[in-house]
From Swiss-Prot:
Keywords associated with the record: Cytoplasm, Schiff base, Thiamine biosynthesis, Transferase
Region (Disordered): 248-268
PANTHER family in the cross-refs: THIAZOLE SYNTHASE
Active-site residues per Swiss-Prot or TrEMBL entry: K100
EC numbers: 2.8.1.10
Name of the protein in its database record: Thiazole synthase
Primary location: cytoplasm
Iron-sulfur is among the record's keywords: no
GO MF term (any one): thiazole synthase activity
Catalytic activity: [ThiS sulfur-carrier protein]-C-terminal-Gly-aminoethanethioate + 2-iminoacetate + 1-deoxy-D-xylulose 5-phosphate = [ThiS sulfur-carrier protein]-C-terminal Gly-Gly + 2-[(2R,5Z)-2-carboxy-4-methylthiazol-5(2H)-ylidene]ethyl phosphate + 2 H2O + H(+)
Pathway note: Cofactor biosynthesis; thiamine diphosphate biosynthesis
Amino acid sequence: MDTLVIAGKSYTSRLLLGTGKYKDFTETRAAVDVSGTQIITVAIRRTNIGQNPDEPNLLDVLPPSQFTLLPNTAGCYTAADAVRTLRLARELLDGHALVKLEVLGDQKTLFPDVVATLEAARILVKDGFHVMVYTSDDPIVARQLEDIGCAAIMPLASLIGSGMGILNPWNLQIIIDKVKVPVIVDAGVGTASDAAIAMELGCDGVLMNTAVASARNPILMASAMRKAVEAGREAWLAGRMPKKIYQATPSSPSEGMITGSPHSAANN
């Protein structure tokens, strides 16, 4: 079976889904179910998973017994804040070690601060975390994060929440070719074709939130994204035909084609 393996655990779904921006927890659960995802991301600074006892708890709707939770550090702008946030998540989730690290460098673009990201990754890996890390599409940084010991590299396709799709497929392709841990596109996916393209490039998975939660029909979009990720993966496994410039090839065989008879040719 074709599975995604992260930190030693296998998953049949290659779609990772965020839990923010839905109108309520009921819609969140419905989108998660339709998407078929097995890994859901949770922004610890914005979502209650037990740190606020008097508020609705996401874990009542998406229990850890049914899904792999991926606590993330959305909203963190320093390595220290990111490390502190994920240590809190580990306490709230009874020692859960799989986390998503993101250290932002700019409030307007939400580009990652790669220097702070590298610093936080070193601390977290040394502290026993399995770190899936949001980063730029710089292949050198991706290799450095892999060398530190990160469990998955998560380069952006374009700005978080922009829906602009994959702006630099060439860098993504280099990252895919150079690192051995899973490469999961994170940020910028806007519609199903973006997810399919990411998978056709050879990405191991796609993480999204806004593309589903901000769609006119989030539940239907979750279904579309599931199919797109599956189709893109199958296309990559199948191997696309080579592109040819100025070399058209008929799809029908040329043998046995009907040609004009010598008699008719002579009469002409």
